[in-house]
């Protein structure tokens, strides 16, 4: 206890706070307590850190091994595809030019048929569009003609002519009724 009070006394008489680097002047008991506490609590923390690091390393190694196996499988599959392609290349070379020429002719024939179908479809579409436009123009012309006729009739009809037209139409309807009876 005397050492503790001496240290407080020496602190108050000291000119400032400083670190005593002389190991012989420091209190060995205090240092051993601090080191003991650090070792006791630090051991668990350090152990946890090392365990976590060990788990991360082992999981990384395991995933790397799995990736390596996957890459090896993919490499084997790629080699198998390469062998198949090489076999097909040899087969095509054996069959030779005649097969290629036949396929070329078939493609040309199919393209020609498709072209004719597209041409027919284009012509049919143009024809239908022309008919639609003609029908639309006819409707517009008919509508305009009816509007002009109505305008002409309305401008020329007076009440007397209007009454005569109505009477004439009534007479026509009566005559048609008599014929059907």
UniProtKB/Swiss-Prot annotation:
Name of one Pfam family that matches: ATP-synt_B
UniProt keyword list: ATP synthesis, CF(0), Chloroplast, Hydrogen ion transport, Ion transport, Membrane, Plastid, Thylakoid, Transmembrane, Transmembrane helix, Transport
The keyword Cytoplasm is annotated on this UniProt entry: no
Stretches of the chain forming a coiled coil according to its record: none
Membrane topology category: Single-pass membrane protein
Single annotated GO MF: proton-transporting ATP synthase activity, rotational mechanism
GO CC annotation terms, alphabetical: chloroplast thylakoid membrane; proton-transporting ATP synthase complex
Cross-referenced CDD domains: ATP-synt_Fo_b (cd06503)
Location relative to the cell: Plastid, Chloroplast thylakoid membrane
Transmembrane spans: 28-50
InterPro entries: ATP_synth_b/b'su_bac/chlpt
PANTHER family xrefs: ATP SYNTHASE SUBUNIT B, CHLOROPLASTIC
Other comment: In plastids the F-type ATPase is also known as CF(1)CF(0).
Subunit organization: F-type ATPases have 2 components, F(1) - the catalytic core - and F(0) - the membrane proton channel. F(1) has five subunits: alpha(3), beta(3), gamma(1), delta(1), epsilon(1). F(0) has four main subunits: a(1), b(1), b'(1) and c(10-14). The alpha and beta chains form an alternating ring which encloses part of the gamma chain. F(1) is attached to F(0) by a central stalk formed by the gamma and epsilon chains, while a peripheral stalk is formed by the delta, b and b' chains.
Similarity comment: Belongs to the ATPase B chain family.
Role: F(1)F(0) ATP synthase produces ATP from ADP in the presence of a proton or sodium gradient. F-type ATPases consist of two structural domains, F(1) containing the extramembraneous catalytic core and F(0) containing the membrane proton channel, linked together by a central stalk and a peripheral stalk. During catalysis, ATP synthesis in the catalytic domain of F(1) is coupled via a rotary mechanism of the central stalk subunits to proton translocation.
Protein name as annotated: ATP synthase subunit b, chloroplastic
């Amino acid at each position: 206890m005397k050492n503790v009070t001496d240290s407080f006394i020496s602190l108050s008489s000291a000119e400032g706070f400083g670190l005593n680097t002389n190991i012989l002047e420091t209190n060995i008991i205090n240092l051993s307590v601090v080191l003991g506490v650090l070792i006791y609590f630090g051991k668990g923390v350090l152990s946890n850190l090392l365990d976590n690091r060990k788990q991360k390393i082992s999981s990384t190694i395991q995933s790397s091994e799995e990736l390596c196996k996957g890459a090896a499988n993919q490499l084997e599959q790629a080699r198998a595809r390469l062998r198949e392609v090489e076999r097909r290349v040899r087969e095509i070379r054996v069959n030779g030019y005649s097969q290629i020429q036949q396929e070329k002719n078939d493609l040309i024939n199919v393209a020609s048929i498709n072209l004719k179908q597209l041409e027919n479809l284009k012509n049919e579409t143009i024809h239908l569009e022309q008919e639609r436009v003609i029908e639309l123009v006819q409707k517009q012309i008919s509508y305009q003609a009816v509007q002009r006729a109505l305008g002409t009739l309305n401008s020329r009809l007076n009440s007397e002519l209007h009454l005569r037209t109505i009477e004439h139409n009534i007479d026509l309807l009566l005559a048609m009724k008599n014929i059907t009876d």
